[in-house]
Swiss-Prot record:
GO terms for molecular function: DNA binding; tyrosine-based site-specific recombinase activity. It comes from the Bacteria. GO terms for cellular component: cytoplasm. Residues 14-104 form the Core-binding (CB) domain. It is found in: Cytoplasm. InterPro entries: CB, DNA_brk_join_enz, Integrase-like_cat_sf, Integrase_catalytic, Integrase_recombinase_N, Integrase_SAM-like_N, Tyrosine_recombinase_XerC/XerD, Tyrosine_recombinase_XerCD. HAMAP family: Recomb_XerC_XerD (MF_01808). The active site is at R170, K195, H263, R266, H289, Y298 (o-(3'-phospho-dna)-tyrosine intermediate). Residues 125-311 form the Tyr recombinase domain. This is Tyrosine recombinase XerC. One of its GO terms (biological process) is cell division. It holds the Pfam family Phage_int_SAM_1. It comes from Methylobacterium sp. (strain 4-46).
């Protein structure tokens, strides 16, 4: 059970709390969902149980199995009234369906109401990649010269962002690397364990290796082989929030829009490769997407604009 959602704090009867605990354990250990995904699923179910309790129904397993479509629609309407968007509602339904399947597997019966409720339609947002020059600038240690922070911290931030743009990593994947994983000293690949514990091999180009080597040379801490590769100013694991704040500061200095985030560098990696006639399935493998359809959304980005940008700066060239 997640530490943030102890069983005794969940709304509902004891049988529901026990079922939720076993369900979340299944998601984490057998389905190998990431901690963030398990947390989101737990939160969705907790909100639904709280909604049922506010409506005057003490949630227990028999009452959940006997749910009517109108009960689910009432929950969705209440969440919409609270300002929750379509994507979050779609995930909430996915969470409820996952829990319902768990109840069915455990022999409690079928929650047939869920099959009668459609997921909200959500228009898929296009990725918002950065122009090549902006992505190169964000991932460049030179752009940080003069900042009022220790040189090793500037080198660290540059190395993290170089991994996002130069290798297409998610920020959680980059910050989850151990010291012994660092692709330096002749190593030019990374083994990444991504969403759903899916493993992929990622090539690491020379500018990224150089950024990592510069950080390691400057870092004042003795990094244990099995410890985090990236550390904060006190030597503990680096928080994603620190990287986000660093990018926000650079955004202002470079005059970039609010869409210039750490994750935008991963979008830029994929879109810029595709614009250079990169193979879609190869890009899918590099990004760690389970479905090709997820990668195909990058084909809708204006490739003509990107090709023009590539004439000014090529991301696979010697610059980062």
């Amino acid at each position: 059970m997640l530490q943030t959602t102890p069983p005794d704090l969940l709304p509902g009867a004891a049988d529901v709390r026990e079922a939720v605990a076993s369900w979340l354990t299944l998601l984490a250990r057998e389905r190998r969902f990431s901690p963030n995904t398990v947390e989101a699923y737990a939160r969705d179910l907790r909100q639904f149980l709280a909604h049922r309790a506010r409506a005057g129904t003490q949630p227990d397993i028999p009452s959940l199995v006997a749910l009517k479509p109108r009960d689910l629609r009432a929950f969705m309407a209440a969440r919409r009234a609270e300002g929750i968007g379509g994507r979050s509602l779609m995930r909430a339904l996915a969470s409820l369906r996952s829990f319902a399947r768990h109840l069915e597997r455990e022999g409690h019966g079928t929650v047939s109401a869920l099959s009668a409720v459609r997921s909200p339609k959500v228009e898929r947002r296009l990725p918002r990649p950065l122009p090549v020059a902006a992505a190169v600038a964000l991932a460049s240690p030179d752009i940080r010269a003069g900042e009022d922070r220790p040189d090793w911290v500037l080198a660290r931030d540059a190395a993290v962002l170089a991994l996002l743009y130069g290798a297409g990593l998610r920020i959680g994947e980059a910050l989850g690397l151990r010291r012994k994983d660092a692709p330096v000293g002749g190593l030019d690949t990374l083994t990444i364990v991504g969403k759903g514990q899916k493993t992929r091999m990622v090539p690491v180009i020379a500018p990224v290796q150089a950024a990592l080597a510069e950080y390691l040379a400057a870092c004042p801490y003795a990094l244990a082989p099995d410890g985090p590769l990236f550390v904060g100013q006190k030597g503990g694991p680096l928080s994603p929030r620190v990287v986000q704040l660093a990018v926000a500061s650079l955004r202002g200095a470079l005059g970039l829009p609010d869409s210039a985030t750490p994750h935008a560098l991963r979008h830029s990696f994929a879109t810029h490769l595709l614009a250079r006639q990169g193979d879609l399935r190869a890009i899918q493998d590099l990004l760690g997407h389970a479905s090709l359809a997820t990668t195909q959304i990058y084909t809708k980005v204006d490739s003509a604009r990107l090709m023009s940008a590539f004439e000014a700066a090529h991301p696979r060239a010697g610059r980062m």
